[in-house]
Amino acid sequence: MTILKNQINKGIIFLIRCYQKYISPMFPPTCRYYPTCSNYAIDAIKKHGIVKGIIMGIFRILRCNPFVEGGVDVVPEKFTIFRNDDK
């Protein structure tokens, strides 16, 4: 089962990398956070697994809008859908 999970993780990460390489360059950079939302999603999947990682990535994308300040927001050690405010 872990081999299957590993392959699914790699497949999702591959799709995100394809987005980064082929789709993202067609648009001006707009992400207000570091790391970018797509890199955050990859890190979250690697750290927390596919389900929690995708959930964290989706909520990060929802937070990335013109009404927020942005800044550094790395993937926290513990699963959460909120911004990591560790200083």
From Swiss-Prot:
<dbReference type="GO" id="GO:0005886">
    <property type="term" value="C:plasma membrane"/>
</dbReference>
<protein>
    <recommendedName>
        <fullName>Putative membrane protein insertion efficiency factor</fullName>
    </recommendedName>
</protein>
<comment type="similarity">
    <text>Belongs to the UPF0161 family.</text>
</comment>
<keyword id="KW-1003">Cell membrane</keyword>
<keyword id="KW-0472">Membrane</keyword>
<dbReference type="InterPro" id="IPR002696">
    <property type="entry name" value="Membr_insert_effic_factor_YidD"/>
</dbReference>
<comment type="function">
    <text>Could be involved in insertion of integral membrane proteins into the membrane.</text>
</comment>
<dbReference type="Pfam" id="PF01809">
    <property type="entry name" value="YidD"/>
</dbReference>
